[in-house]
Design a protein with these regions (language model features):
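Non-heme Fe(II) oxygenase metal-center motifs and adjacent flexible, charged/small-residue loops
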Residues: 1-207
């Protein structure tokens, strides 16, 4: 195993510090290319609440939320077109991080891209729309730092917090796969590559 700066929530849930930092420019260029094909939008929950982070997708499947529920779709319900192809750097980085975290041969088929502006947040939630919970989740942070909340298997358990910085990855799975997680509101700040924004790539095996 390479010399990696692990910051553990548990044996099954790891922060890999600076893991993506050497690839940041390439990752941001790929996000820009994806957005040209499928722009960011503020999705709504099934109850009609608009999410504060704007989102887009790439890969074989895209995660969507609307009045019909939370789910994965092979085509964008807004355009009826397939999602943009997932860049190889996304897939390769997620596979490498998963391997280094003990989850061997992870093959993601969906990448949700969140864009956070100041004050945008993500409430505690579980990722449970996937078909196979034996597959881990890989999350890549770019831009402004944020406080990540990592809770338990019930919403009432008090979450542990860690700051996530530009280039950090979080990998979790196994018995932690359905732990609640979220982020606190993004603070006003500036990053030299993305200004006042934070981007988050969440790679999953949806099908």
């Amino acid at each position: 195993m390479r010399n990696i700066d692990f910051d553990k929530f548990s044996e099954h849930s790891l922060v890999l510090r600076n893991y993506a930092k050497n690839f940041d420019t390439q990752l941001l260029e790929e996000i820009e290319n994806i957005v040209k094909q499928n722009d960011f939008r503020h999705m709504k929950t099934p109850k009609g609440h608009q999410m504060s982070a704007s989102m887009t997708n790439c890969g074989e499947y895209g995660w969507v939320s609307d009045k019909f529920g939370y789910r994965y779709e092979k085509t964008d319900p807004k355009t009826n077109q397939p999602w943009p192809k997932m860049p190889e750097i996304f897939r390769d980085l997620a596979r490498s991080a998963a391997d280094d975290s003990g989850y061997i041969n992870f093959e993601s088929d969906a990448c949700l891209i969140n864009r956070y502006q100041p004050k945008a947040a993500m409430a505690l939630h579980q990722d449970k729309d996937e078909h196979d919970f034996t597959q881990p989740i890989v999350s890549i942070s770019l831009g402004i730092s944020v406080t990540f909340l990592f809770g338990g298997l019930t919403r009432t358990e008090k979450p542990v917090t860690k700051e996530l910085h530009h280039g950090d990855l979080v990998v979790w799975g196994g018995p932690d796969r359905l732990r609640f997680h979220g982020v606190r509101p993004l603070k006003n700040n500036t990053h030299p590559l993305v200004g006042p924004l934070r981007f988050n790539l969440t790679l999953r095996k949806a099908n």
